[in-house]
Amino acid sequence: MAFDGTWKIDRNENYEKFMEAMGIGMMKRKLGAHDNLKLTIQQNGDKFNVKEASNFRNIEIEFTLGVTFEYSLADGTELSGAWTLEGNKLVATFTRKDNGKVLKAIREIVGDELVQTYIYEGVESKRFFKR
């Protein structure tokens, strides 16, 4: 599938404002903006394996489209939610366990980039990855 491959962060748009809305402190926001995130995505039907490697952690996540699973952000925020495929976009709706607020994430291929959009409390951010 189009998402398969290894993607390295190239640039961010409004990412620090997004992290601020999420309640992440200034020091972690500054570090998070330069995390050197690399995603390795493999899709097999409706199952995905995503490896996240950054300056802060290396984790592997497996999920099935439409099936709720638990996930922790790099800052420790715990979420519960599911990814779905809407056209050519991977769309996730996660609920924070600490306050019940919704975090939406969208992954889509635009040209030769993987664009990951986050929406939380009206703040939208984009992260752009290149193969």
Residue positions per predicted region:
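Hydrophobic small-molecule pocket/channel-lining residues, especially in calycin-type beta-barrels
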Residues: 1-131
